[in-house]
Amino acid sequence: MIEHNPTTIYGTTIVTVRKDGKVVIAGDGQVSLGNTVMKGNARKVRRIGKGNVIAGFAGTTADAFTLLERLEAKLEQYPDQLMRASVELAKDWRTDRYLRKLEAMMLVADSKVTLALTGTGDVLEPEQGVMAIGSGGNYALAAARALIETDKSAEEIARKAMNIAADICIYTNHNIIVESLDAQ
């Protein structure tokens, strides 16, 4: 778990939902420095690779960008192989002294697979097609799990889960960015 430090940049909630031929990653736009909101419209969900992978990141911003860049390099090395690229990144993350100190997590998805890349170098797949990370991750995860068996679309579930997390978590706001892909 990331420890709270008043001089560290925190925040964010990222959620992913895979349902009915769609995969969605949604995230809020808040960046906090200690207990102060520094920015409300940061973009923490984006397309990477050749646009066929979506990623959302939580944790300290510089660390998250470092990992995102490393994942993009692995995707260039292993095109159209998100699982392989993620495992190779995790190997680096676990063995490189510099990378081991990074405080960030990512959710990544392509048409075939959704993965969480953790700060300990784990690569995890969701059990029920939903996963969430970040300061409001537990709230978003609970909301998404409650909604996954309804007739709502993947995007509707992700947006509702993010709004619930933003209502509860002080490090999450309602400025929600959503990226989606067709899924197999």
Curated annotation (Swiss-Prot):
Enzyme kind, highest EC tier: hydrolase
InterPro entries, per database record: ATP-dep_Prtase_HsIV_su, Ntn_hydrolases_N, Proteasome_sua/b, Proteasome_suB-type
PROSITE patterns: PROTEASOME_BETA_2
EC identifiers of the protein: 3.4.25.2
CC annotations in GO: HslUV protease complex; proteasome core complex
A Pfam short name: Proteasome
Activity control summary: Allosterically activated by HslU binding.
GO molecular function, one term: threonine-type endopeptidase activity
Primary subcellular site in the record, as a coarse category: cytoplasm
GO BP annotations, alphabetical order: proteolysis involved in protein catabolic process
Keywords, ordered alphabetically: Allosteric enzyme, Cytoplasm, Hydrolase, Metal-binding, Protease, Sodium, Threonine protease
Residues annotated as the enzyme's active site: 12
Binding of Na(+), residues: 166, 169, 172
Compartment(s): Cytoplasm
Catalytic activity: ATP-dependent cleavage of peptide bonds with broad specificity
SUBUNIT field: A double ring-shaped homohexamer of HslV is capped on each side by a ring-shaped HslU homohexamer. The assembly of the HslU/HslV complex is dependent on binding of ATP.
Function: Protease subunit of a proteasome-like degradation complex believed to be a general protein degrading machinery.
Family: Belongs to the peptidase T1B family. HslV subfamily.
Protein name: ATP-dependent protease subunit HslV
Annotated organism of origin: Brucella abortus (strain 2308)
Source lineage: Bacteria, Pseudomonadati, Pseudomonadota, Alphaproteobacteria, Hyphomicrobiales
